[in-house]
Amino acid sequence: MKKKITILLVFIFTIFLIGKSFSAQITIDAYGMDKYFNYDVDKGRQFLTYSSEGLFVTNIGINGVVECKGIVEIITGITSSNIMCKYAEDNGDIFFAQFFIKRGTVSEDATVQSFEFVSGEGRWAEIVGQKCIGAYTPMAQERFMWKGKCEMSNKTLERVKNYKKPD
């Protein structure tokens, strides 16, 4: 009986530690202007090219500019996309993130995307391969707002946050 209780306590403690080690989160907010060029291919089918420029801010004090380009396709109400964004922080380091629409369409109020850090310099090299989630909201006059979040370990977030660019 003592052995079972010990195993159970070790199991609970391990789950607690794992939960604590992956409890950190980085958030990215972006705001800017976007443009769509639309082909009405056929009834129920649209092909759009997408581009945007804007600013981004994070919850860890990193800011910069973002530029995105890609395609969006809508076939009988189902939206797919492939959008690549280049983020450049104030110190010159860049990262690329690739976005895929998971829910919603560009004609609705918002879309939810999955995105992944596919390339990065400096602090961003630490999270290449990280998969995250974001939400895009179109605004009036070709404006947009976007918010993304990425779950990661506390240690990884601390390394990203405290990164010092070599001289």
Identify the residue ranges that each predicted region occupies:
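Bacterial N-terminal signal peptides
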Residues: 9-16
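Composition-driven detection of intrinsically disordered, low-complexity segments
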Residues: 7-9, 25
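Positively charged n-region of N-terminal signal peptides that target proteins for export
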Residues: 1-4
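Beta-strand-enriched cores of mature, soluble protein domains
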Residues: 21-167
